[in-house]
Amino acid sequence: TPEHQRYIELFLVVDSGMFMKYNGNSDKI
């Protein structure tokens, strides 16, 4: 369903953002 696809895309965006933030903090340390 379109709603399910939208939810997956949102999850991927959030997951990617958290991953980049984690990498930034790790690299900073």
UniProtKB/Swiss-Prot annotation:
Its EC number is 3.4.24.50. It catalyses: Cleavage of 4-Gln-|-His-5, 9-Ser-|-His-10 and 14-Ala-|-Leu-15 of insulin B chain and Pro-|-Phe of angiotensin I. Keywords: Calcium, Hemostasis impairing toxin, Hydrolase, Metal-binding, Metalloprotease, Protease, Secreted, Toxin, Zinc. It is found in: Secreted. It is an enzyme of class 3 (hydrolase). One of its GO terms (biological process) is proteolysis. Residues 6-29 form the Peptidase M12B domain. Ca(2+) binds at E9. One of its GO terms (molecular function) is metal ion binding. It comes from the Eukaryota. The keyword Repressor does not apply. Expressed by the venom gland. Binds 1 zinc ion per subunit. Its cofactor is Zn(2+). One of its GO terms (cellular component) is extracellular region. Snake venom zinc metalloproteinase that impairs hemostasis in the envenomed animal. Belongs to the venom metalloproteinase (M12B) family. This is Snake venom metalloproteinase bothrolysin.
